[in-house]
Amino acid sequence: MAETDQPGKIFIGGLNIKTRQKTLQEIFGRFGPVARVILMRDRETKKSRGFAFLTFRRPADAKNAVKEMNGVILDGKRIKVKQARRPSSLESGSKKRPPSFSRTRGASRILKCGRGGRSRARSGPSCEGNLGGDRYTPNFNVSSSGRHFAVKRNPSSKRDGPPSKRSATSAQTRSNTGLRGREPHRREISRNMPRGEPASSRRDEYPLPRDYGQSSNDRKYESTSRGYCDYGNYHSREESASKVFSDHAGYLGGRDRDFSEYLSGNSYRDTYRSYGRFHEAPSARGGNNRYDDYSNSQDGYGGRGEPYISNRSNIYSSDYERSGRQEVLPPPIDREYFDREGRQERGHSPKDGLYSASRESYSSNTKIWGIPWRSWRKQI
């Protein structure tokens, strides 16, 4: 702390921290009346800082005290006593401040931020610090206004900071190529196995034990045979009967190995070929031509009707015993002939009148489980 420049004021330095203000007043009071004694203390600890200022009422007393007391040992320490003076660089009545620049000049020199250039500000202390791994470190150069600071690049932060976007991309590419051969075992297995394969295809590739020795038509027959067992539950029977019969016809065509004895002479395939080609147009109700043309050939229909029904019943009974089903329902071919008779009465086919006599004799002689066709129709 600088005091006002007065002729009777002296500076006393090099004091012991145990020296008190009252002791100084008593010692220097021998040279003349003392007007004021100031012992400089620390603001926080309140301890002596080792120097003091003393003011005499007369300037001549101050000069005598400087001559007599300079270099004297006081409380074990040699003290320095001299005339207190204000520094020549400062004006009277103003406080000591560091040299300053103008605003424009300070701002132009301080606010410089670049990779190669540095700030040239020469005023005020600088405070450097790393901002948590960033590549730029603030360099606070306080000017006279205290508002400007410069930011310069820290060379160590370039190495310690996060990599740039280009370097991160190249590092990621190198890591992908390097780790391609060291992927986990789980991903290798999943890459070899097919993705998104439905459960049905896997079930077809690995059939159950009950499917051994059967072709794809066998599985088709098992699925369609369920529709055949539910045959008696439908009220509209024409389309369902034709669909089920066509499925069974395809099934018998694929059973060459297991049912070779039925295909020898009286099978469905030979009987079907003896019926001839199709000559009748499709009916108005969407009937199947294959079933309508069974009645167009009188020789094939009348001559081979009974063996056909006996063979068909034997085939269906053996098929159901093979698939493990206990219930046996009437074959769809008999139902088709029965529907053909009903169509004749309603007049759907133009050629049905030619063979009405043969169909009547056939339907009267044919029985299912000991019940004539007409009584069976009434029961349904």
From Swiss-Prot:
Region Disordered, annotated ranges: 82-226, 279-358
GO molecular function, one term: RNA binding
Annotated tissue distribution: Testis-specific.
SUPFAM superfamilies: RNA-binding domain, RBD
UniProt keyword terms in alphabetical order: mRNA processing, mRNA splicing, Nucleus, RNA-binding
Iron-sulfur found in the keyword field: no
Comment field (misc): The RBMY1 proteins are encoded by repeated regions of the Y chromosome. The exact number of functional copies is unclear and may vary between individuals, and some of them may represent pseudogenes. Overexpression of Rbmy proteins in mice carrying the Y(d1) deletion that removes most of the multi-copy Rbmy gene cluster does not have any effect and fails to reduce the frequency of abnormal sperm. These results raize the question of the role of Rbmy proteins in sperm development.
Function: RNA-binding protein which may be involved in spermatogenesis. May be required for sperm development, possibly by participating in pre-mRNA splicing in the testis.
Name under which the protein is recorded: RNA-binding motif protein, Y chromosome, family 9
Naturally occurring in which organism (per UniProt): Mus musculus
